[in-house]
């Protein structure tokens, strides 16, 4: 690997320095140094997580609760220990936590899923870590950690695959780093990543199609029809069941990653945790020129209220594909996608929606 590729810490120092000036969405001087330190700490923990994942089923404590795995517990413990050592992280929110866990008197709250795709571990399939950094407020009366505002200061993910990839944004583009064993850290390998303007891949679990809303069923059906249908080009379907891996492929190759609302059970009707999954990945994709939506509105504009585990449907990827799925939702709500049922022409009618390109 070429030595000209900057290390993560050097890149962050240069990348955040120009943001000390005032402006919309700008990280202030007080945050620039703190964010550099926290992102460096997260990257160091990602290295340790990658080493632990590489051990597979070797060693580790037995699961304490049904559904837990030894690997999942070990990875979560690494992230918690990092937050407790950090001078910059005031609190941590992980899946299953009732509220933000206070860790220090720092400036930031870290929202994270320490091991996305954990169910894939036994199959030796790619796993991930996803995170979002936001401002912390004053401590609450019960000693808890208060989250101040909804604006993200930084977001990113780690993908543990053939290589360990660390992808981040602080609002000035999306950038990817690869773990270099020889140099002992992450080096910049993907500067200013861009979602391709055209993509022909769908990341979706087709086994749940019967639970989707009609506009999603319409979109996926048209893609499956390929060049013989209204889309007039062929699509491929991929589904890893690891959101970080599916998002990374969409970021690199374009297309659409879909986690739609499902009707089968109300608590999971809206699929993805908003604060530590959906909005982190949405910001990364938008900073790379793509779009991210709930199907009805911009994902980054969605509000969680007081619920740190609020969930949302999620569609992200190539701009034109996200715009299409949003249009299908609007047409469905206006009743414009209903089949034309003329007793004279029925399915041969030119007025059916399928006949309109």
From Swiss-Prot:
Give the signal peptide, or none. Answer: none
Q: Which residues bind substrate?
A: 205
| One function term, GO molecular function aspect | fructose 1,6-bisphosphate 1-phosphatase activity
Pfam families (alphabetical): FBPase, FBPase_C
What are the record's GO terms for cellular component? cytosol
Question: Which UniProt keywords are given for this protein, alphabetically ordered?
Answer: Carbohydrate metabolism, Cytoplasm, Hydrolase, Plasmid
Query: Where mainly found?
Result: cytoplasm
Under what name is this protein listed?
Answer: Fructose-1,6-bisphosphatase class 1 2
State the species of origin: Paraburkholderia phymatum (strain DSM 17167 / CIP 108236 / LMG 21445 / STM815) (Burkholderia phymatum)
